[in-house]
Regions:
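Conserved alpha/beta core of the MobA/IspD/sugar-nucleotide pyrophosphorylase nucleotidyltransferase superfamily
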Residues: 5-8, 179-242
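Short, structured coil segments at secondary-structure junctions
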Residues: 52, 72-74, 157
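Short, high-confidence coil segments that cap the C-terminus of an alpha-helix
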Residues: 53, 104-106, 135-136
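Short phosphate-binding loop-to-helix
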Residues: 57, 63-110, 118-122, 126-129
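Conserved core of the sugar-phosphate nucleotidyltransferase
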Residues: 93, 97, 117-204, 210
Length: 242
């Protein structure tokens, strides 16, 4: 391992960055310029700076993304098959393919989506350490939710607001306690358990709490703009832990 942290001794950690070429909502999203460099570069830099990660690989079907990733020092050991690069392909399938293709003895895996450019190396290390500390099979990055569950809902065909059906007990708990959501910044798992169960979240998933200011998950052009505004002054920001 790259760390002197005794809690990490005996563990080998693989970081997998998934980045297919076909993005419907934001075409070419992974290579869009954010803060002066391609969006995917922020995740690659953080992963390479993480002390707990032994190897960082990219899973992509796109030659342009591959070239950019390699220019930032990311390993691209294979080309992702087309059937795993569609809208229907799941992240679970992508990770299973990566693990089976590499066929190496990593006991912990980390899925790092390029859409979380504000995530730091310290966040990656924290998520992995939490999994090890709790002796859990899975750990996910989460962030506080600003709005209570019952404030969300659908708009019916007649234009009326149809709120989520939240029980009184859940509503009270939400008002008394903090509510959290998966922020997409990190999914950590023990590889053998993942191969067997094929899930990132099970009944005993641990959490690594991240603040709102590092939890942006880019899914729209507006969110891409927000990330660009935040990161533009930080083009030389060191993603390594302080």
């Amino acid at each position: 391992l790259n760390s002197n942290d005794k809690s990490l001794v005996g563990h080998s950690v693989l970081a997998i960055i998934p980045a297919r070429g076909g993005s419907k909502r934001i075409p070419g999203k992974n290579l869009k310029t954010v803060g002066g460099q391609p969006l995917i570069a922020w995740t690659i830099r953080a992963a390479l700076a993480a002390k707990c990660v032994d190897r960082v690989i990219l899973s992509t079907d796109d030659s342009a993304i591959m070239a950019i990733a390699q220019s930032f020092g990311c390993d691209v050991p294979f080309i992702r098959p087309k059937h795993l690069s569609t809208d229907q392909a799941s992240s679970v399938d992508v990770v299973l393919h990566a693990l089976s293709t590499l066929d190496q003895g990593f006991d912990i895996g980390v899925l790092l989506q390029p859409t979380s450019p504000l995530r730091t190396a310290e966040d990656i290390d924290g998520c992995v350490k939490q999994l090890i500390k709790a002796n859990a099979n899975t750990c996910v990055a989460v962030s506080p939710v600003a709005h209570r569950p019952e404030w969300h809902g659908f708009i019916a065909n007649d234009g009326c607001f149809d709120p989520f059906r939240v029980s009184r007990s859940v509503s009270k708990a939400a008002s008394d306690e903090d509510v959290y959501m998966l922020n997409g910044a990190g999914f950590v798992f023990r590889t053998q358990s993942f191969i067997k169960n094929e899930v990132f979240v099970d009944g005993a998933t641990q959490t690594y709490i991240m603040p709102e200011e590092r939890s942006l998950d880019i899914d729209t052009s507006f969110q891409l703009h927000i990330a660009d505004v935040i990161l533009t002054p930080d083009i030389h920001r060191d993603p390594s832990p302080k």
